[in-house]
């Protein structure tokens, strides 16, 4: 057992002893629930922070505050609530009357304080403590070096501690909530209806990914946590709801990385009588307005860069992007879509770039992998990438001028994909054939290929109007708005391996 663990156990024992010592003096409960707060710290700062010391004394304003003790220096306490921090001061008369109880307070305890509001000589507001009540005794101490809480793994495993001590973490999740609310409000103003679709699917679909599998005991059948809500949302468009959206979780049984978590949040929406170009315009409008609303500017820092959400956003085909970011590669500069259709040509090109390839990859998959290897990470400013091949876009409508590609885009910022959208495939026969091609790919070893969904084909046979749909990764978008570079910093409880 380490010295640090021994010291922590000693502190826990001391705090338990303090709790036991006050129990006999508690007529009802050592964890009372009758104290009522009148103000939060930030409210007091906003309403009275500009007053002079003399004005506050003349006002004689009494308040009740509540929160966690974050510092204790002699007769001063620093109390933190959800809005911020404020000091409380115990006068000598109070200390004499409540000295033993006051000395028993520890950093981390949650207390309620009532008293008159004053201004210190340094210009800080404080509550002159007339009475206080211990509301919750903290049995575990905060980390000794809690300012900053440098241990990343502890921050993720004990997010509650991280939120107590790390203002940046609190602000990140406050911003996350604001981003989600702003997106929801934007969609409602655009006359989209918010809906909820199943989280457990009989057939996983809507994206190319490996699903989580569970078992429904009552029905005695396997079920899958959803990898995307797409096929259910489009069924609703078939049913006559012309504009729908959903903000919810998706689950993909894949690896962990700074940009991937198996459980993540998406906003997915569908819009009848629109195409993928309409979605790009809508995305520009949404993100620029949200940035200005939440940050006061369309420009925001991201690492060493400044991302400009003001628009218009760049629009490049995947082939154009590969050529733009490989200016010295003569083969790539001369490449055409006819060559992209040649799987052997694409294999040789990928190998020449030092890439490891899978034998079942199609020409479209090879093009996408080359794009990811050489171009994607360089797309710092908002950029729409179009021209995705049909073989990697099984639910997207083919382009009228070039049937090899689809009317699809992915949206990139900060070197990563944030959104994916396309004009929907509403040809039931074409969709049937593409599902069958996905089954063949799965049989060939691609465990991320889609399943065949016969009921969805039936829905299409009833008629899906011309429709466009898009998914936006909320977690990755919040990473941009909070200038963070790992997805775990914007997910409250990210996936972690069990501790040994």
UniProtKB/Swiss-Prot annotation:
Q: Name the Gene Ontology biological process terms.
A: lysyl-tRNA aminoacylation
User: Is NADP set as a keyword in this record?
Assistant: no
Reactions catalysed: tRNA(Lys) + L-lysine + ATP = L-lysyl-tRNA(Lys) + AMP + diphosphate
Q: Which PROSITE patterns match?
A: AA_TRNA_LIGASE_II
Which residues does the annotation say bind Mg(2+) 1?
410, 417
Cofactor remark from the record: Binds 3 Mg(2+) ions per subunit.
Q: Name one GO cellular component term.
A: cytosol
State the compartments where it is located: Cytoplasm
Query: EC number(s) per UniProt?
Result: 6.1.1.6
Report keywords, A-Z: Aminoacyl-tRNA synthetase, ATP-binding, Cytoplasm, Ligase, Magnesium, Metal-binding, Nucleotide-binding, Protein biosynthesis
What's the cofactor?
Mg(2+)
GO MF:
ATP binding; lysine-tRNA ligase activity; magnesium ion binding; tRNA binding
Q: Where does Mg(2+) 2 bind?
A: 417
State the Pfam families in the record. tRNA-synt_2, tRNA_anti-codon
Question: Does the keyword field hold Ligase?
Answer: yes
Q: Which family does it belong to?
A: Belongs to the class-II aminoacyl-tRNA synthetase family.
Q: Tell me the PANTHER family matching this sequence.
A: LYSINE--TRNA LIGASE, CHLOROPLASTIC_MITOCHONDRIAL, LYSYL-TRNA SYNTHETASE
Assembly: Homodimer.
Q: What is this protein called?
A: Lysine--tRNA ligase
Q: What is the lineage of its organism?
A: Bacteria, Pseudomonadati, Pseudomonadota, Gammaproteobacteria, Alteromonadales
Q: Which gene encodes it?
A: lysS
